[in-house]
């Protein structure tokens, strides 16, 4: 129904090709964080007729709003993993100077918020420090019990990890700890856990954002989402 391609940048004199963008296959979560699709974007006329064309109230990010409305109606979103679009850079373009159209980023935020409203997801969209990136705060429709299952062999580490979760913003938690890293034991803990959601974490986790559980629980309340994880950064 719709498809998009990879792209790069081209100099104003058409001599230099640089900054290729090799995009992933369709990711609705990534699209709500950044308009990674941009160019080329191709849609069936029937999709465009149903969803409508570009809208003036989204000037600066009218393509972002248009893409959202098209993918909402599409049964399949395709990705051609070849650089088929060359975005010309000049001083007045976003390609050459991201700060040249600051209003575009507010329009982008509005496009994401409107998408959430159309598909029935309760969320607030915020700007991130880097221009063109957005963060979604999912509203908690309810606060289900989350069973935090800490696995490992070091009692001190598990105790420290347990204390972190007791101090977090999300209070409806049930903390369970294994006596080792045996798969059967961890599965047994999961079976007897009382929570609607299970959060598996290693004793080696050294820090957790205050709202980590709330953020992930919010994502899990979205229809068709069955599992979620945050980014884990190791020392090596």
Regions found by a protein language model. Give the residues of each.
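Conserved donor NDP-sugar-binding/catalytic core segment of glycosyltransferases
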Residues: 1-17, 205-236
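A recurrent flexible, glycine/aromatic-enriched loop bordering the glycosyltransferase active site
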Residues: 10, 16-42, 46
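Non-catalytic membrane-proximal stalk/linker segments that position and tether the catalytic domains
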Residues: 22, 92-164
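Donor nucleotide-sugar recognition loop
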Residues: 52-68, 100-103
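Catalytic donor-sugar/metal-binding loop of nucleotide-sugar-dependent glycosyltransferases
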Residues: 58, 68-86, 113-125
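Short, acidic, metal-binding catalytic loop of nucleotide-sugar glycosyltransferases
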Residues: 163-172
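Active-site nucleotide-sugar/metal-binding loop of Leloir-type enzymes
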Residues: 183-197
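Short beta-strand-to-loop acidic/aromatic patch adjacent to the donor-nucleotide binding site
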Residues: 194-208
């Amino acid at each position: 129904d719709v498809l998009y391609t990879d792209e790069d940048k081209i100099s104003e004199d058409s001599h230099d090709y640089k900054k290729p963008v090799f995009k992933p296959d369709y990711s609705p979560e990534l699209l709500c964080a950044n308009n990674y699709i941009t160019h080329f974007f191709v849609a069936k006329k029937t999709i465009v007729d149903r969803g409508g064309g570009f809208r003036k109230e989204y000037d600066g990010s009218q393509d972002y709003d248009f893409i959202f409305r098209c993918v909402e109606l599409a049964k399949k979103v395709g990705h051609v993993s070849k650089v088929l679009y060359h975005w010309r850079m000049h001083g007045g373009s976003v390609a050459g100077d991201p700060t040249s159209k600051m209003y575009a980023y507010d329009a982008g935020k509005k496009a994401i918020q409107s998408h959430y409203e159309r598909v029935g997801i309760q969320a607030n969209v915020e700007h991130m420090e880097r221009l063109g990136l957005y963060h979604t705060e999912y509203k908690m429709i309810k606060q289900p019990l989350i069973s935090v299952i800490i696995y490992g062999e070091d009692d001190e580490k598990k105790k420290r990890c347990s204390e972190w979760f007791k101090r977090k913003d999300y209070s409806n938690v049930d903390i369970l700890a294994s006596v080792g890293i045996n798969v059967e034991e961890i599965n047994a803990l999961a079976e007897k856990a009382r929570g609607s959601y299970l959060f598996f974490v290693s004793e080696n986790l050294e820090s957790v954002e205050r709202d980590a559980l709330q953020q992930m629980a919010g994502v899990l309340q979205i229809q068709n989402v069955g599992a979620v994880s945050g980014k884990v950064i190791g020392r090596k």
